[in-house]
Amino acid sequence: MSLTEEIKKRRTFAIISHPDAGKTTITEQLLYFGGEIREAGTVKGKKSGTFAKSDWMDIEKQRGISVTSSVMQFDYAGKRVNILDTPGHEDFSEDTYRTLMAVDAAVMVVDSAKGIEAQTKKLFEVVKHRNIPVFTFINKLDRDGREPLELLEELEEVLGIASYPMNWPIGMGRAFEGLYDLHNKRLELYKGDERFASIEDGDQLFANNPFYEQVKEDIELLQEAGNDFSEQAILDGDLTPVFFGSALTNFGVQTFLDTFLEFAPEPHGHKTTEGNVVDPLTKDFSGFVFKIQANMDPKHRDRIAFVRIVSGEFERGMGVNLTRTGKGAKLSNVTQFMAESRENVTNAVAGDIIGVYDTGTYQVGDTLTVGKNKFEFEPLPTFTPEIFMKVSPKNVMKQKSFHKGIEQLVQEGAIQLYKNYQTGEYMLGAVGQLQFEVFKHRMEGEYNAEVVMTPMGKKTVRWISEDDLDQHMSSSRNILAKDRFDQPVFLFENDFALRWFADKYPDVTLEEKM
């Protein structure tokens, strides 16, 4: 098979949702259809002992939540599928946002009883900003939920995207009978031995069923007043195909997968800082690091840099340019993933995600190229933390483990590190409280380094240039610190303290990140 044909087989997407909408469960079912797991297990909390394949970190298994992005790959129906299962918890939106830079499409999972929730809306806005296609799976039809028409209306009003139902539920909860498949023009049956039936058989199968009569009325209304189906509008991110189903009972998931692969896009090009778009079919390899993960194998205290291949082909042992440093690197120890398990890979192509063993060479956002190509891809989003804690080792004899743990976990980008200019104290910044809990848990479990964490409350953060810096600017209402890149930064007590500082030093430029 030619390189072009291999690249065109790839389908790389992320699954996004609010916590508990069923995102990890649908991931399990997709892996089941891809033959990667023998049984799609229910995602449960710590008492059951049954863990999701994509939840590999110890704390994820204990709490039944996803706190880090997982990468999984399988072959299905002639396509090579790369799934990125992202954290649903809002505290880990930073990891999720960066992951969304590495995909060509998104699958949005919505709880049929709750509709569009806060985290779903936030993540959708990032996807919308990138104009990548969004496929919607409305989940949990095995439970009572809201009316389908009401859910479609909310999609359009809250998210501002047109929708087109690919199927329609027949009943819901205990009265759930199946799906009226508009795309494949058939019925998918929830009960009984037969999985499918013709639409012509519907009146006989559901005679005297009030739900089926309502379905026919809804579909007639949609055909008269709903949006037209347009493959181009889907690819442009202007129309979301909507699928109904139940991930828990594995109903409607395979139909979703088949139809998704029919319309999901091939790998797309990525913009450089100069505004050029790198074509995925270009033979020269290029890629970017969108994530760094420490201790995927706790026995080896390793670090993996996750790279999205943008163009060309990776071959084991190839030399690459690291544009940020201007230095070369050799890609010898490279893997692909099934959550925490991995296997060495000798080649991969545009659209694939590979893991490069990292000894501290790479940073999130790094561009890798070959030959004389020295461009950089557009930077990944960075976020200003909102809450802070001082951190120190509980046992001074564990200083070495403490520093190693902080260094590795900070390089993952899940938490940010600052050092007080005057005292040298370490301060951690996060988007949400759960990040601190995970940090503490991982420091103790993975590095055997207990930590003392002292809350500092919320702070308003602004960066300042070295040229403007004067240590006398520090006061009781702000803390002068350095970030992990040694850039000076002020942590202001509140917005009032920030305004007071800006009035006192009008010539000083204060920079805010995302």
Curated annotation (Swiss-Prot):
Report the main location listed first in the record: cytoplasm
Glycoprotein in keyword set: no
Q: Which PROSITE patterns match?
A: G_TR_1 (PS00301), G_TR_2 (PS51722)
Q: What are the binding positions for GTP in this chain? A: 17-24, 85-89, 139-142
Domain of life of the source: Bacteria
Give any Pfam family that matches: EF-G_D2
> Which keywords describe this protein according to UniProt?
Cytoplasm, GTP-binding, Nucleotide-binding, Protein biosynthesis
Task: Please list the GO terms describing molecular function.
Answer: GTP binding; GTPase activity; translation release factor activity, codon nonspecific; translation release factor activity, codon specific
Compartments, record wording: Cytoplasm
User: What cellular component GO annotations does this protein have?
Assistant: cytosol
A Gene Ontology biological process noted in the UniProt record is: regulation of translational termination
Q: Does this entry carry the keyword Cytoplasm? A: yes
InterPro entries cross-referenced by the UniProt entry: EF-G-like_DII, EFG_III/V, G_TR_CS, P-loop_NTPase, PrfC, RF3_C, RF3_dom_3_sf, RF3_GTP-bd
Residue ranges of every copy of the tr-type G domain listed in the record: 8-268
PANTHER family in the cross-refs: PEPTIDE CHAIN RELEASE FACTOR RF3
Q: What the protein does?
A: Increases the formation of ribosomal termination complexes and stimulates activities of RF-1 and RF-2. It binds guanine nucleotides and has strong preference for UGA stop codons. It may interact directly with the ribosome. The stimulation of RF-1 and RF-2 is significantly reduced by GTP and GDP, but not by GMP.
User: What does the sequence similarity comment in the record state about its family?
Assistant: Belongs to the TRAFAC class translation factor GTPase superfamily. Classic translation factor GTPase family. PrfC subfamily.
Mind telling me which HAMAP family this protein's record contains?
Rel_fac_3
Q: What is this protein called?
A: Peptide chain release factor 3
Species source reads Streptococcus pyogenes serotype M49 (strain NZ131)
Upper lineage is: Bacteria, Bacillati, Bacillota, Bacilli, Lactobacillales
